[in-house]
């Protein structure tokens, strides 16, 4: 299957009432499990390399891994840079084969966010690469607060940047270990009304209950980022493997026991968005 772009997998969601998952990758084992899950569900998938992943594994290595998985998959696979800090990391990702980049200027003023996002979007478009941006800070369950997305700013932001997708702050939080995020559905409706046709993204998808994901997928929310649920599945499987035989030490044998549980968790995430 040819590597897919962000536009190719998100645009159909606006009309068919579904969403695509952006799954946070930390290594080969989970990336492979995510693709197998997508193939089993016959759905597209977005493989995401966030700051933590990039601190552990260089982008050229991640790019090669994502490209290999995409080119050998039977479903569309998007290689996505998550939370790019500046235009330089976005350009490096493109040079490494990524088909989608996110520039996160949410902590900046509106004017600076528009200006820098526009620069990234202009650069990425010249390579046929999709761009996600963020308007309004999405906070963390264990720290930084959210600022919320102002619906009154959305139309101008989209008009002036031309991004392919917009991450919004509506009560969602990164790193929630259980569902229950206080999602402001009225604000989502206001944002969608301000920019009809713009695919919206919710980071912190693990904090959003599966039934609510299904409901939100029938709006303009076309992408849910999910990581914590999958890391929890990986950690539980690895602990169980070690506890069964504390003397085990073979890395490949141990990690192989995480693949089925992570695949199952990824399949559940994919099913929750349609």
Which positions does each model-derived feature cover?
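An acidic- and aromatic-residue-enriched active-site/binding cleft used to recognize and process polar
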Residues: 136, 205, 229
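Generic enzyme active-site microenvironment
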Residues: 80, 132-134, 201, 269
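Conserved oxyanion/phosphate-binding beta-strand-loop segments in alpha/beta enzyme cores
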Residues: 1
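Cofactor-binding active-site loop characterized by glycine-rich and histidine/acidic residues
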Residues: 56
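Histidine-centered catalytic micro-motifs
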Residues: 23-25, 79-84, 199-207, 212, ...
